[in-house]
């Protein structure tokens, strides 16, 4: 009977034979076999002397296999292993117990060097294993693993080198040198024979594994098989299976110690089963008293207590001592207390770059992702997969976030994304949709959401970091999520009506040729019958050749092919459609380009080049995207670059996001409602600083993997931090970076990162920088909630500002404080009726910090300075205006930055708001970077020569140019931020003038004239100049310079802005708002 006819029976029989033979060989007693063997030529080194060691990529950590698999890559190809017996330690005894000789063997493999200690009995056991393997390999057992081994050793010499047979007790001290040489030769010959070198018994004898020789994991550390106890994790809510010791189990694991972490692997599968980071709480204790285990070792850090068990007390002492010695030698920086209580050290001479607004930031993130070779880490409060990172869109979907991630995943890059799992009743960011969308792109993309609110009992706090990390070598840190509404540039446009719009100065419908009239009628009929949202066509016209013009400058139009432009960059997926652009009011703003093109295609011969821009299109601060135009019998159609597609066009105070699973469908009418511009700050760091950012991400990822059962599968791997020793090897560098001293800061706690003690290093750094500033501080922040009363508000930032100003006053010193915050909080609500309860609650605490109450900054200053406080501090917001469909409109610019600059030499950039949620550490998780300049440039401070830092000064100047409107006017002197001329005649004067003009033209809210709700109703009913007399209003608006406006201190000052009793906001704990 053939195998073909009876496959099941014969397969079962063969498997039984294989199992029996395996058992026979496993139990084979090789002690009677001769140790002396025939000498053969063992030199199997590569014949080509040019062969160099092969670099094992870092990505190999994701492809580990079971230790007994025959085809695993452990060694550097073409690189020999050299063995040298350095010394022999003899342990004598007065009893009848034989003396023990312990051999110290030094091994070298490429750049790696390590030592192992072995007794002669270990050599004997190792030799017997190899003899057993030699006999076993001759038997044709039909298993995949065995067949592979037989095929690969068929042509290799199988004769083994000899091992000395004489007993150790017979060796005299003067014979040690000879014995050392014999053992050294034995190992050298074994290691030259691939058949034995690749066998798992050899790798275990040498204390090596698949992770031993990966360059980016740093020096070869301590390794070996050991027993570990389950449990010990510091996970909120876990008892017997967490920290408690009521129930546990022992498992055999392969322990690996590296310079900044240790891990253990499962020998059968090769899977990394846990990673323990070295930190300031890292301690090792040995003994039953400390471990409650005979021959136990206890290893503590901020996240876990790990219990190991050895074969003897001497073995446990050796393990404990070896680990401690290695960590002290290679990981000492991680054991120290660092400045501000941070988990990260100060990294000197690191490369750093700043970003003002998201345009440059998104572009550099996209370019860095494109350069990724191994890993991309992303964590955001909110992530929108369909956003475009480079705009205007001129290359189809190439620079759309989900397309970039899919492309890199297909190239083998591992992508790990952590999202904040929101309380769905409170927030509509739909992280579940984001996760589902990204996970189905490619298996190399893994997404986690945290926290689980029920199991963790975390309902009030959020993961608020915004990080992108490339190959653990470049990291982007700041306040910008990869999400809708964030992209903006220095123009802060209010309008984005899209591809084509009708200018009514063209011919009337009555003057159309009959063919064109028929075409327009057919368009009208087709639009009634075909729903436009189902048309798979990109509806933005992407102008490749044009560039953005300055605000208020005339724009020239040139001829272009509408049909060609509409179809040049089609999207690859049916879902990937942009929101529909309007052609004219005649089509009610809802006609699709698809219908327009098919209706007009027969009549393209009617098109002709246009002349200069029509009157009304060159008004200051109007949308100034790149424009093309064409003439038709219908009127003149002007094509404009669209920057914000679908949900990206937003005004969240007017209306919050809805239907995020329809990314390219508009949710507000862009023809009647201006968008809300977004002002933000971010940074990029390299090398060791980027390693520190990655370390935080890895800590959070591994903690979430342990905490949530759905992530415990092998498809969600543990992440490993790269070594600081290789951090200088930058494969990619962000253009425009400068050298500076960089330190990472964070807010983290048990719920967010699984650590024993909370960290509030961002708060400590803010207070320290403010207290030690000498000339000025410049703050941009989304919130301004401080001035501790130790009852409701606890962070000390506002108090530090007030005390620093008072100190300057007492010392008769010039000192300036610039604060730029949003004019309104970013919550949905109609400010004309007082705003929503959430909006009012934030307004209450902002005003409480700035100017209302004795604990406020101005309250503290007025008590000693009277009205002189105005010479020290300025509070401002940002506002802009434009023309939308023939009407003048205005909107505040939403300041989302989290920035502090001091003295043109120190900068803090991050995700942390100035409020208790971000600063106290126990609440929201945050990330920030403090940059202190080492490179200086000549400057001026208080009228005197001053050496300013390149990083800080450059960032401060760019912020000033943007908000003051000096980007295109270098003649204005903004070098000296302390002088009276700049502070009073430029900064304060510009803010006051702009605010006055906006109030005059638009009667803006918030407004100092409105002290209560009765005045608010009267205020909004009064006529608005922008509507009553647009021409005069335009003349007034020409006097506007930049975006800076004074912050209105007295808006609704006679009202209680805290949530009223009975509202759902009043039920929420006060900590949510602070």
Curated annotation (Swiss-Prot):
Signal peptide: none annotated. One of its GO terms (molecular function) is phospholipase D activity. Keywords: Cytoplasm, Disease variant, Endoplasmic reticulum, Endosome, Golgi apparatus, Hydrolase, Lipid degradation, Lipid metabolism, Lipoprotein, Membrane, Palmitate, Phosphoprotein, Repeat. It is a lipid-anchor. A lipid is attached at residues 240-241 (S-palmitoyl cysteine). It is an enzyme of class 3 (hydrolase). It is found in: Cytoplasm, Perinuclear region; Endoplasmic reticulum membrane; Golgi apparatus membrane; Late endosome membrane. Residues 459-486, 891-918 form the PLD phosphodiesterase domain. The modification Phosphoserine is found at residues 499, 561, 629. Gene3D superfamilies: Endonuclease Chain A, Phox-like domain, Pleckstrin-homology domain (PH domain)/Phosphotyrosine-binding domain (PTB). Residues 81-212 form the PX domain. Residues 219-328 form the PH domain. One of its GO terms (cellular component) is endosome. Expressed abundantly in the pancreas and heart and at high levels in brain, placenta, spleen, uterus and small intestine. Stimulated by phosphatidylinositol 4,5-bisphosphate and phosphatidylinositol 3,4,5-trisphosphate, activated by the phosphokinase C-alpha, by the ADP-ribosylation factor-1 (ARF-1), and to a lesser extent by GTP-binding proteins: RHO A, RAC-1 and CDC42. Inhibited by oleate. Interacts with PIP5K1B. Function as phospholipase selective for phosphatidylcholine. Implicated as a critical step in numerous cellular pathways, including signal transduction, membrane trafficking, and the regulation of mitosis. May be involved in the regulation of perinuclear intravesicular membrane traffic. It is linked to Cardiac valvular dysplasia 1: An autosomal recessive form of congenital heart defects, characterized by valvular malformations involving the pulmonic, tricuspid and mitral valves. Belongs to the phospholipase D family. This is Phospholipase D1. The gene is PLD1.
């Amino acid at each position: 009977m053939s195998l073909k006819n009876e496959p099941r029976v014969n397969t079962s029989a063969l498997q039984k034979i294989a199992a029996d033979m395996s058992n026979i060989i496993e139990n084979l007693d090789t002690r009677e076999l001769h140790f002396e063997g025939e000498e053969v030529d063992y030199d199997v080194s590569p014949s080509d002397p040019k062969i160099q060691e092969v670099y094992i990529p870092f990505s190999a950590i994701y492809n580990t296999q079971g230790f007994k698999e025959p085809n695993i890559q452990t060694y550097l190809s073409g690189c020999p292993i050299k063995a040298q017996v350095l010394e022999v330690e003899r342990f004598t005894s007065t009893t009848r117990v034989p003396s023990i000789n312990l051999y110290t063997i030094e091994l070298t493999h490429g750049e790696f060097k390590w030592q192992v200690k072995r007794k002669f009995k270990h050599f004997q056991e190792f030799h017997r294993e190899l003899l057993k393997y030699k006999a076993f390999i001759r038997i044709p057992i039909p298993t995949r693993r065995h067949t592979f081994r037989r095929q690969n050793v068929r042509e290799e010499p199988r004769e083994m080198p000899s091992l000395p047979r004489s007993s150790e007790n017979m060796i005299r001290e003067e014979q040690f040198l000879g014995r050392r040489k014999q053992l050294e030769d034995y190992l050298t010959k074994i290691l030259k024979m691939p058949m034995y070198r690749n066998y798992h018994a050899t790798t275990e004898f040498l204390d090596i594994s698949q992770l031993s020789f990966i360059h980016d994991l740093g020096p070869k550390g301590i390794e070996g098989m050991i027993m570990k106890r389950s449990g010990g994790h510091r996970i909120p809510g876990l008892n017997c299976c967490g920290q408690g010791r009521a129930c546990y189990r022992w498992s055999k694991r392969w322990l690996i110690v590296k310079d900044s972490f240790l891990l253990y692997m499962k020998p059968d599968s090769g899977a990394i089963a846990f990673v323990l980071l070295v930190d300031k709480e890292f301690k090792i204790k040995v003994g039953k008293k400390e471990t409650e285990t005979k021959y136990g070792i206890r290893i503590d850090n901020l996240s876990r207590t790990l219990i190991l068990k050895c074969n003897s007390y001497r073995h446990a002492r050796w393990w404990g001592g070896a680990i401690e010695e290695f960590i002290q030698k290679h990981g000492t920086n991680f054991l120290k207390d660092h400045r501000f209580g941070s988990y990260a050290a100060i990294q000197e001479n690191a490369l750093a770059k700043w970003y003002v607004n998201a345009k440059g930031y998104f572009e550099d993130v996209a370019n860095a992702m494109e350069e990724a070779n191994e890993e991309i880490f992303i964590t955001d409060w909110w992530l929108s997969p369909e956003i475009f990172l480079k705009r205007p869109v001129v290359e189809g979907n190439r620079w759309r976030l989900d397309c970039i991630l899919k492309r890199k995943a297909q190239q083998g890059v591992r992508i790990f994304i952590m999202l904040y799992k929101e309380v769905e009743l409170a927030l509509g960011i739909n992280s579940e949709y984001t996760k589902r969308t990204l996970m189905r792109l490619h298996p190399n993309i893994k997404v986690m959401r945290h926290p689980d609110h029920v199991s963790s009992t975390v309902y009030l706090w959020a993961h608020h970091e915004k990080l992108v990390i490339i190959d653990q070598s470049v990291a982007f840190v700041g306040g910008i999520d990869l999400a809708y509404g964030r992209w903006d540039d220095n123009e802060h446009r209010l309008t984005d009506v899209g591809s084509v719009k009708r200018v009514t100065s063209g011919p009337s419908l009555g003057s159309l040729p009959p063919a064109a009239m028929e075409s327009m009628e057919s368009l009208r009929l087709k639009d009634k019958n075909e729903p436009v949202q189902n048309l798979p066509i990109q509806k933005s016209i992407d102008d490749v050749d044009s560039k953005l013009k300055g605000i208020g400058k005339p724009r020239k139009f040139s001829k272009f092919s509408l049909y060609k432009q509409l179809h040049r960059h089609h999207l690859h997926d049916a879902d990937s459609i942009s929101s529909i652009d309007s052609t004219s009011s005649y089509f009610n703003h809802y006609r699709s380009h698809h219908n327009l093109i098919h209706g007009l295609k027969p009549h393209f011969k009617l098109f002709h080049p246009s002349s200069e821009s029509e009157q009304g299109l060159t008004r200051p601060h109007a949308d100034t995207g790149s424009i093309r135009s064409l003439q038709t019998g219908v009127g003149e159609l002007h094509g404009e670059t669209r920057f914000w597609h679908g949900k990206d066009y937003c005004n969240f105070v007017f209306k919050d996001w809805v239907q995020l699973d329809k990314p390219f469908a508009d949710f507000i009418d862009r023809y009647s409602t201006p968008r809300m511009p977004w002002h933000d700050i971010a940074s990029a760091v390299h090398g060791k600083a980027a390693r520190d950012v990655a370390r935080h991400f890895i800590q959070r990822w591994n903690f979430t993997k342990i905490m949530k059962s759905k992530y415990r599968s092998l498809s969600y791997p543990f992440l490993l931090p790269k070594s600081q020793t290789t951090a200088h090897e930058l494969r990619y560098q962000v253009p425009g970076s400068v050298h500076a001293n960089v330190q990472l800061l964070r807010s983290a706690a048990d719920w967010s990162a699984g650590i024993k003690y909370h960290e509030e290093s961002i708060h400590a750094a803010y207070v320290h920088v403010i207290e030690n500033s000498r000339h000025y501080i410049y703050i941009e922040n989304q919130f301004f909630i401080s001035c501790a009363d130790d009852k409701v508000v606890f962070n000390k930032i506002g108090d530090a500002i007030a005390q620093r100003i008072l100190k300057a006053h007492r010392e008769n010193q010039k000192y300036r404080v610039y604060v730029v915050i949003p004019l309104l909080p970013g919550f949905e609500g109609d400010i004309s009726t007082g705003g929503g309860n959430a909006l009012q609650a934030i307004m209450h605490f902002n005003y409480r910090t700035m100017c209302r109450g004795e604990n406020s900054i101005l309250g503290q200053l007025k008590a000693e300075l009277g009205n002189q406080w105005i010479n020290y501090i300025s509070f401002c917001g940002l506002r802009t205006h434009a023309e939308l469909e023939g009407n003048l409109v205005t909107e505040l610019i939403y300041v989302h930055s989290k920035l502090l600059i001091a003295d043109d030499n120190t900068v803090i950039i991050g995700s942390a708001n100035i409020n208790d949620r971000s600063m106290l550490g126990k609440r929201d998780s945050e990330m920030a970077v403090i940059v202190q300049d080492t490179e200086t440039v000549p400057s001026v401070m208080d009228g005197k020569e001053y050496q300013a830092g390149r990083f800080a000064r450059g960032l401060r100047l760019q912020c000033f140019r943007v908000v003051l409107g000096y980007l295109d006017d270098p003649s204005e002197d903004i070098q000296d931020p302390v002088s009276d001329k700049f502070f009073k005649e430029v900064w304060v004067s510009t803010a006051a003038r702009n605010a006055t003009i906006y109030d005059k033209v638009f009667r803006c809210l918030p407004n100092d004239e409105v002290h209560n709700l009765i005045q608010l109703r009267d205020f909004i009913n009064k006529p608005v100049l922008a509507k009553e007399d647009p021409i005069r209003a335009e003349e007034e608006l020409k006097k506007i310079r930049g975006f800076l406006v004074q912050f209105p201190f007295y808006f609704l000052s006679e009202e209680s802005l805290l949530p009223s009793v009975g509202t759902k906001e009043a039920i929420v704990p006060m900590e949510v708002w602070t």
